[in-house]
Amino acid sequence: MHRSTILYALSAIVSLAYAGDFSKSCSSISFRSTSISASCDDKFGDSAGTNIDLTRCLANVGGRLVCRPSNPSFKFCDCGLAGDRSVLNCRCTDSTGTKKPTSIDLDSCLTNDGGDLAC
């Protein structure tokens, strides 16, 4: 029983290490259409390919991108990753139809959940 308690505590620590800041434990980060792909470390120290559709995580609010996992609406934006691969630079349409420049640090929206990208 003592051994299982230690294993549980260690897995909790590993989970906390991946909370937010996905780019610290993921590499080969790329963006295509509305998805981020990366190779992320899992809780065993192995690395595996994963991806996430940002329409589940981001919203275009008046031409500005925000993290919004509860009610996402990542529409009407043309985007690309910045040089550090964790910032998404976009031009998003506001309510008047005007394209506005906006960017968001994906480390504030995405997390590495045991090798899988999550909002």
How should each PLM-predicted stretch be described?
Residues 1-19:
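Fungal secretory targeting signals
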